[in-house]
Amino acid sequence: MDEQEAVFMIERIYVKDISFESPNAPLSFVQTEAPTVDVGLNTASTVVEGMEGLTEVTLTVTVKAKAGESTYFAVEVQQSGLFRVQNIPEEHMPALLAVHCPTILFPYAREVVADLVGRGGFQPLHLHPVNFEALYQQAQTQQQNYTTQ
């Protein structure tokens, strides 16, 4: 392999942290009011020290289902991946880490959320696909607007 050849490979995908809470069970199982479901996403990346070319990207998915003041369940999943990233131009790195890596990780996190919610006694929650490109562009626009004010 040429030393200057761009390299982007998945080395490993893993769950870094999981949390599931159902603070009002078993009462939440008999509630008739449909809960509102809020989903939050966050992405973080760090270069792994001592492992040349490896970057860890973590996608955190937070889901809360509530009806009024009653919490049906709360889930947080940190789905991580180790990616070998070498000889990628610096200007392409932000999009690679904020768009492409989370796009790879999201289906795994989605599966974990559905499984946890189902094992918690609720109907499995299947999260809708996420357009990380649009989220990235939106964040870039907000950043530009913030810096020009």
From Swiss-Prot:
Subunit structure: Homotetramer, a dimer of dimers. One homotetramer interacts with 1 SecA dimer.
Keyword hit for RNA-binding: no
Localization terms from the record: Cytoplasm
Name the record gives this protein: Protein-export protein SecB
Listed SUPFAM superfamilies: SecB-like
Keyword field contains Cytoplasm: yes
Keywords: Chaperone, Cytoplasm, Protein transport, Translocation, Transport
Pfam families: SecB (PF02556)
UniProt record similarity statement: Belongs to the SecB family.
GO biological process per UniProt: protein tetramerization; protein transport
Gene Ontology CC, one term: cytoplasm
InterPro entries: SecB, SecB-like_sf
GO terms for MF: unfolded protein binding
Chief localization: cytoplasm
NCBIfam families listed in its UniProt record: PRK05751.1-3 (NF004392), secB (TIGR00809)
Free-text function comment from the UniProt entry: One of the proteins required for the normal export of preproteins out of the cell cytoplasm. It is a molecular chaperone that binds to a subset of precursor proteins, maintaining them in a translocation-competent state. It also specifically binds to its receptor SecA.
